[in-house]
């Protein structure tokens, strides 16, 4: 099915957090 907008927003925020953590670790 198609994910709801809220689900997409949460996933995007989690991705942003993971990206920031990745930059910190490098």
Swiss-Prot record:
GO molecular function: oxygen carrier activity
Compartments where located: Secreted, Extracellular space
Principal subcellular localization: secreted
Keyword Nucleotide-binding carried by entry: no
One GO term describing the cellular component: extracellular region
Tissues with expression: Hemolymph.
Function: Hemocyanins are copper-containing oxygen carriers occurring freely dissolved in the hemolymph of many mollusks and arthropods.
Similarity comment: Belongs to the tyrosinase family. Hemocyanin subfamily.
Protein name as catalogued: Hemocyanin subunit 3
